[in-house]
Amino acid sequence: MFLQFFIWGAWYTTIGNYMSAHGMSSQAYLPYTVNPIAAIVAPFFLGLIADRYFATQRVLGVLHLFGGVLMLLVPGATGSPGLFVFLILLYNLCYMPTLGLANSLAFHNISDQEKQFPLIRVYGTIGWIVAGLFIGFVLSRFSAGQLPDTTPLPLYTTGVASLLLGLYSFALPHTPPPGAGRPVSIRSIVGIDALRELGSKSFYVFIVSSLLICIPLAAYYAYAPIFARVGVYDVGTSNVVTSVFPNPSSLMTLGQISETGFMLLMPLMFVRLGVKKMLLVGMGAWVLRYALFAMAAPSAVFWLIVAGILLHGVCYDFFFVTGQIYVDKKSTPAVRGQAQGFLVLVTYGIGMLIGGIIAGKVYNGFKGAATDLTLAQWAKFWPLPAAFAGVVMVLFAIFFRPQTQERPTQASAPTPS
C-alpha cells in the first residue's frame, strides 16, 4: 500500500510544473483529465476481466510492470505534447485498476476488515507524503539547482517504483479472482442496480452534489502545485517551513499530513454534527481554501497559501470519507460494493473529468501566450472555483434532507487526497 500511493504521489503533484517548464503549460491540465478517464474505464476492466479470470496479485504485478515501462517513456516525449499526454493516458489505464485490486487483495488476506484495513490503508497516505519529501530532499540533490518538480526525475522515480512494485506483487499472497464463476453485467459494474435500490430524494441530491463539487476540486489538483511554485518558490520565500518543504511537491504534502490528523477527529465530529453538517463543513472548507488562495495571490502571502493547503484535511475527510460512510449506511450488503463504486465513478471519474477540462480552459484563458499566470491573474482565477463550490454548498444545504443521522463505521477512501 505504501508503494501503491508513493507511485501516484511522485508524479501527480509534479506533472503540472514539469509541463509548464517545458513549453506545455497550455496542456498542463490534460493529465488531470486522462486520470478520470482511466477511473471511468477501471471498473469495467475489473468487473469483466480481472475479478473473473486471473489471480489478483498477478494482474497487479502485470499492470504495474506495464505502467512502469510506459512512465519511463514519458520524459522522452516531452517535445511532443500529444504523445506526452497519450503516454500519460496509457499509464493511467494501467494504474487506476490497481487501486481496486490492491484493496481487494488486502481485504482477502485479513481477518478483521474494519480494524485491520484502516491500519493498512494509512500506509498509502504515508507513501504519498514520503513521495513529496523524497522529491524535495533526495531528488533535489540531482536536479542541478532546479526545482526537482520541473525535471524528469519524479517521472523516472514513478517508473522505477512501479517496476519494483510490479515485481514485488508476484510475491504477495495468492488471491484467487473474487468474481470467478459469478454472473456479471454492465448494470452491476456501473452501479445502476444500487442506484435503483438506494433511490431517494436525499440520495440523489447527495450524488449530484458530489459530482458538482468535484468540478472545482479539479482546479486544486491541477493548479495548486503550480500556484505554490509561483507564489512561494519563484518569489524566493525563505522561512522555517520552506526549509523543511523545499519544493512545491513537498509543500503539498501538508495537505496529506492534515488529512491524517483530521481523520482521527472524524468519529468525535460525526457524533456532534451528523452527516449533513459534516458534508457542509467539507464543502465550506473548499470555499475557504480557494478564498485564501485568492487573498494570498496579489502579494504572495505565504501563510495564507499554507493555510489553504492545510485545509485539504477538512476538505477531503469531511466530504469524501463522510460521503462513503453515508453511502455505506444507506446500502444493503448486496449492493454495497456497487454503491461505493458508483460514488467513485461519479466523483473521481465524471466530476473530475469535467472539472479538469473547465479548469484548463479557464487557466489558459487567463494565461494567453504566457508560460504562467501572474500573481494578479491568480487572484482572479481562484475566486471562480470558490464561487462554484459556494453555490453547490448552498444548494446542498437547502435540498439535502437525510432521513436519519447515520453514525460512522470504518470507511476507506479510494485515493489519498
Sequence positions of predicted segments:
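Cytoplasmic membrane-interface "Motif A"-like loop-to-helix N-cap segments
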Residues: 51-65, 271-283
